Amino acid sequence: MTDFDKIFEGAIPEGKEPVALFREVYHGAITATSYAEILLNQAIRTYGPDHPVGYPDTAYYLPVIRCFSGEEVKKLGDLPPILNRKRAQVSPVLNFENARLAGEATWYAAEIIEALRYLKYKPDEPLLPPPWTGFIGDPVVRRFGIKMVDWTIPGEAIILGRAKDSKALAKIVKELMGMGFMLFICDEAVEQLLEENVKLGIDYIAYPLGNFTQIVHAANYALRAGMMFGGVTPGAREEQRDYQRRRIRAFVLYLGEHDMVKTAAAFGAIFTGFPVITDQPLPEDKQIPDWFFSVEDYDKIVQIAMETRGIKLTKIKLDLPINFGPAFEGESIRKGDMYVEMGGNRTPAFELVRTVSESEITDGKIEVIGPDIDQIPEGSKLPLGILVDIYGRKMQADFEGVLERRIHDFINYGEGLWHTGQRNINWLRVSKDAVAKGFRFKNYGEILVAKMKEEFPAIVDRVQVTIFTDEAKVKEYMEVAREKYKERDDRMRGLTDETVDTFYSCVLCQSFAPNHVCIVTPERVGLCGAVSWLDAKASYEINHAGPNQPIPKEGEIDPIKGIWKSVNDYLYTASNRNLEQVCLYTLMENPMTSCGCFEAIMAILPECNGIMITTRDHAGMTPSGMTFSTLAGMIGGGTQTPGFMGIGRTYIVSKKFISADGGIARIVWMPKSLKDFLHDEFVRRSVEEGLGEDFIDKIADETIGTTVDEILPYLEEKGHPALTMDPIM
């Protein structure tokens, strides 16, 4: 027995062994591994042992196998010895330990069966029609990494089988979505939810995986998080199980009639530390308290599952006519589904958070000035102003922009609400469905009052929201907003690394990557792109013991490379004594660590004397010879990798962007989508650096090539400055 397995000690009272359950698991594991063997032999006969095998968009081969035993499975011939070894661990001796090992073997069998399915995969011909996902690629795991790290996603719920009642299942799923859970759904439960018009798919963090063995894609998603963010070494089986138990707070809802293979797969979850709760009545010889047990009441099943897994939520429950939670943040509202639209250059619109005095505010007051949604016809376009007044004893003018940017998140949490942009270039839509359920403009105010207080309790004492839809009032307050924006921008222009005496740490991701430390400065956003210096400063005011700690800028060692003694001292302690020095302004010597939530990766291209940058959203090959996923697997987990580094996208247009290495003049390749995202600011910075307005056109992208040999002639033809700079190495 391993140290991890001690968590199972005492789970079964002496003399109460559920032998019938263990027998079911044994037969299920034998069936699963035998089926995998038959399919594998057929595949080898058809394709040959040297035929490639793997999933798309991952650097982790077959993740269950890579994680638990470390093998880099690349071809069909690699699989028979692995399957034979796992089949041999399925023992006819019926006890809890052997049942868990049989569960692990079932996960291996399911992974092999699914990998064989992907032998027929073509990028332009998905194996499953939307919204079914099948295997979920690394970019999606990383996309939601920061929400897992900061517990916006409080846990993972894996739902398999068929519910007694589709409406009751829809209620369970909506409850879980409202609380922010990541959902993995398999078998007939998917069809039941689609019948009830529950929104499923990657954008809703609710993955309809498919049927039967496709449940393994929940397992290979969770296991990649350990390797991706936690730096768990492939094959470190016990360390990975410990990580899953501590960091990935998952549970399984096993619904409907039991099947021996599904039950064996459920024991794979138990092997990894995830409890299994079923809605079926279970006799005493088929239960294990806290690990495999029955809750027949659908109104209690989620609460008991959360209690069993140790998940406690303290979020404010809003009384809204629509569902509300992070699951809906990625929802799009198409024109045909829209009831009303505001801003987006179609009508005047703005949003503003401003600090007011105690006498200027009535806490909780929400006022709508102008027509409400029920007073306008479907398809209308309205002007909109959102004015959020804040009073707080510790509130500072510098925090206004931090709170204002969260309006985007908070509104998007509403099902049927859509928000993009900020300040006076915001754009909002409300769906027909949300209006039919009773959504009105005052609900915007209720959301903002509650969330501002919940998220910023240390600096926000009172909140008042005014919603303007009267055009004259919108235009009047738009001028007030513009004056505020100008004041902020003037203040921010003076905020540089040189003008402050304090940097901030961000160790939020240490819940996933224990040795990773971000150093956030006025001119360097956190690598997730979500934490600026002002965000970190506000976070510290909210929670002095939180993830963002002030680091006095003391003991300057090298101002060119960006080395300070105080920063190094903090780094050494915060990285669990793993790192001794960080250079903030160079890629080439002791760069910042990378966890796994980064928006982009930069990598040295010595042949071009420069660097390339790729993003989480770009799945294609790069001139480094690696995709984003492969690069991310190489540098993630809290390690320093000179020549490679994860970054937030806006850092690229900072004056401190690898300034010791030559700055933006070193960039020789980046995806076209990144060029488009940064375009105006990048051109402005290029002019500031004396590189000219057309410098962005001298940088190659995927339309020019994806290898050094393809892009080098282009760089030479365009006279790219990196080619004549001092050697980068």
Swiss-Prot record:
SUPFAM superfamilies: Prismane protein-like (SSF56821)
Subunit: Tetramer of two alpha and two beta chains.
CDD domains named in the record: ACS_2
Major enzyme class: transferase
Binding residue positions for Ni(2+) 2: C595, G596, C597
Reactions accelerated catalytically: Co(I)-[corrinoid Fe-S protein] + acetyl-CoA + H(+) = methyl-Co(III)-[corrinoid Fe-S protein] + CO + CoA
Transmembrane region(s): none
Record function comment: The beta subunit generates CO from CO(2), while the alpha subunit (this protein) combines the CO with CoA and a methyl group to form acetyl-CoA. The methyl group, which is incorporated into acetyl-CoA, is transferred to the alpha subunit by a corrinoid iron-sulfur protein.
Cofactors required: Ni cation; [4Fe-4S] cluster
GO molecular function: 4 iron, 4 sulfur cluster binding; anaerobic carbon-monoxide dehydrogenase activity; CO-methylating acetyl-CoA synthase activity; metal ion binding
EC number(s) from the headed UniProt entry: 2.3.1.169
Top-rank taxon, per record: Bacteria
Protein name, as recorded: Carbon monoxide dehydrogenase/acetyl-CoA synthase subunit alpha
